[in-house]
Regions:
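Active-site environment of non-heme Fe oxygenases that use a 2-His-1-carboxylate facial triad
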Residues: 1-160
Length: 160
């Protein structure tokens, strides 16, 4: 879980950008199926410094749950197969994105395994409080595979 709370907004910019990972994957399955399959393939992404954390953008679990994990900064590195598909991923994210400005006293709480989050560039002295945590009541990670009208990638697809 992630909480972000605004104490002081930026003079300009700093809007919140949120995209539901389920909607992003559904868009990819429909518009760029090859990208959806590749982005669910194990070890196609490395997140973090040093050797990184080998991962993938969409992890398809046996129970049908699909958590999402994505960085688009200097701490993200990709398998050589992935870069040609990043424009399709970015289009899918942009097509699903919610954009809003937080005023003092406003914030949001989201499931970090389901929602993609970012912010726009800003000027001024923006001040937000951020906290990461685990829910008291167990929550399954990500979203359910059966939430799709189009067939999402399966583990079998991701290993091709």
């Amino acid at each position: 879980m992630r909480v972000l709370f605004c104490l002081r907004p930026a003079a300009e910019g700093g809007e919140v950008l949120l995209a539901d990972g389920r909607d992003v994957l559904a868009s990819l399955v429909t518009e760029a199926r090859e990208a959806a399959i590749l982005l669910a393939k194990a070890r196609t992404a490395y997140f973090g410094a040093g050797a990184g954390y080998p991962s993938q953008v969409f992890t398809v679990h046996v129970d049908g749950r699909i958590p999402v994990r994505l960085r688009q900064d200097g701490l993200a590195r990709w398998s050589p197969l992935v870069p040609p598909h990043l424009p399709a991923l970015r289009r899918a994210i942009a097509g699903c994105q919610l954009r809003f400005r937080l005023e003092p006293g406003q914030g949001y709480l989201l499931d970090n395994h389901r929602w993609l989050h970012a912010r726009t560039r800003f000027t001024g002295h923006r001040l937000c409080l951020r906290a990461l945590g685990e829910p008291r009541v167990p929550m399954p990670p990500g979203f359910a595979r059966d939430a799709f009208s189009a067939r999402p990638p399966t583990t079998r697809d991701a290993t091709c």
